[in-house]
Amino acid sequence: MVKIYAPASIGNVSVGFDVLGAAVSPVDGSLLGDCVSVEAADLFSLRNEGRFVSKLPDNPKENIVYQCWELFCQEIGKTVPVAMTLEKNMPIGSGLGSSACSVVAGLMAMNEFCGKPLDDTRLLRLMGELEGRISGSVHYDNVAPCFLGGVQLMLEENGIISQPVPSFDDWLWVMAYPGIKVSTAEARAILPAQYRRQDCISHGRYLAGFIHACHTGQAELAAKLMKDVIAEPYRTKLLPGFAAARQAAEDIGALACGISGSGPTLFSVCNDMASAQRLADWLRDNYLQNDEGFVHICRLDKTGARQLG
């Protein structure tokens, strides 16, 4: 049997709409991500379990893990009968790369089980294709960090899909999921078709500056440049309490705060555990809206998807 864990990820990381992503894991060692296991069988089967299993489609063929199996078999040119189990620990429509977790874990599990017939680049292309079926367009800002780990910059040139960006080891990423759903398609539809020239210039400056600061080890500068002029101004209306949470993060001394992916999860960067804990407590008391919500203090997950056991 092969069992793969794929971690949560922050799409965009505020400053890099559709071109930047970061994988995260809780500092307490708990698994914030999905697991998929594969074992030999006479016929294909898929079983679902985990905290958020009730959110999955009733029809197995609509399940993204079934589609992983189907696409993988097409790619290698043969049908592989297996029993797959999806452990759905990630809320759907959370802004934590939930669909990417299932896609990455599903495809990587099949590839490992079959003796790695596909290299990482081919596997990543399939992951992007499947992610596109869910969100409406192929993009890698969740699947690339989830699969490869760390902070990834999407390039999609010269046969290179993404490359790693140096990160800051002392940064703590406070993740708060309020327990409500925002669909990626809805969050994309709310964005304007065209942007003002000044916003385009600002976006280029922030993103280029952030990448430069990461490569030159300037943590304070990098944090200051984590600004989103593309999506956040429009998406905040989908997120009750976001403005108050952002203000609280600033008051507590967070270095940066933004929307994780399409939301509603919020992320905030702190450089000491005391501030991170204070902010986590505030978010738990004020940003969560129901029992499904949660707050985790995380670090970057530099490993990405991996085999368990």
From Swiss-Prot:
Subcellular location: Cytoplasm
Statement: the UniProt record of this protein carries the keyword rRNA-binding: no
Main location, first listed in the record: cytoplasm
Binding site for ATP: P91, I92, G93, S94, G95, L96, G97, S98, S99, A100, C101
InterPro entries: GHMP_kinase_C_dom (IPR013750), GHMP_kinase_C_sf (IPR036554), GHMP_kinase_N_dom (IPR006204), GHMP_knse_ATP-bd_CS (IPR006203), Homoserine_kinase (IPR000870), Ribosomal_Su5_D2-typ_SF (IPR020568), Ribsml_uS5_D2-typ_fold_subgr (IPR014721)
HAMAP family, alphabetized: Homoser_kinase
NCBIfam families named in the record: PRK01212.1-4, thrB
Name of the protein described by the UniProt record: Homoserine kinase
The organism's taxonomic lineage, starting at the top: Bacteria, Pseudomonadati, Pseudomonadota, Gammaproteobacteria, Enterobacterales
